[in-house]
Amino acid sequence: MTLPVYSRADLSRIAILVALFLTAISTSVVAREFRAADTQSEDYPTVQALRYMGRVIAERSDDRLQIRVFHSRQLGEEKETIEQTRVGAIDLNRTNVALIGSFVPAMNVLAMPFLFRSIEHLEKVLDGPIGNEILSSFEPYGFVGLAFYDSGARSIYNSVRPIHSIADMKGLRLRVQQSELMSDMIRALGAEPIELPYGQVLTGLATKLIDGAENNWPSFVTTDHYKHAGYYTLTEHTMSPEVLVMSQKAWQSLSADDRQIFRDAAIQSSQFMRAKWKDLEERSRRQAEAAGVKIVTDFDRKPFEDAMAGIYAKAQRDPATAALIERIRKVE
């Protein structure tokens, strides 16, 4: 039997191919994929931020750790994905504080109406000791809080009439998040709250199941709600942020070094997201104006704030909640 004779160049090429093959096998064995959920569309700033975070984590872990982002409600509506994250079926989740407040009580404070004076006030709270304390409060409930994302200011829009006073709210059927706090707020303003999953709002507007809803500029425009609701009143009643959480199950499986990689990447993604958000917010408002949406800025704000007295009285029965609200108000 005659054995094949290989040249030095052939042997070199074979060695390279074997090395690449072994590297591929090694990578496939040690690489781990984390599933991240976001109900927003693919080009939304929070989805882009999750992908940015994934790139940072992959780079810092030499591709051992990978994030796969599921957007556009691919893993379910937001409340469903929160529950899946709590039990460990989803590893990472971007969610609004009003929804996760059903699981983590401290988050309801950030969703309180008319609590923040401005976006700058909000960011000072989130970036400081209070924000860190709130993120730490997730752990007893099956989550690990990693970072806050911006969500702008939520305002009320509808298809029936411009809202200049609280009297104009009477009788309007307004979609709210699946949150007791949000339902109480709309009811206190004289309207009828209709709890609907985010993905059903457009159909609800088109079929007149609801008269309107409340959300920020990008959500109003990117979902095409502006095509069915021609009045947008700058109530800016809440400035509740988004929050990025990880399941306790996934977190406990990480080494101390890898946990730090995730924390650092999450903070970086928050800054990345804020820049993307501010640009989209401006473009969304211009698009709504160009489409003929009537933007109401001259509404009587004080009666709206006064109507929240009962909501605050209920929340402040808990001494810890009352103290947190007071601390937030004192941040300059």
Where do the language-model regions lie?
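Bacterial N-terminal signal peptides that target proteins for export
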Residues: 2-16
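Bacterial N-terminal signal peptides
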Residues: 13-26
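Bacterial Sec-dependent signal peptides at the C-terminal "C-region" and cleavage site
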Residues: 26-32
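N-terminal secretory/targeting leader peptides
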Residues: 32-121, 129-131, 136-332
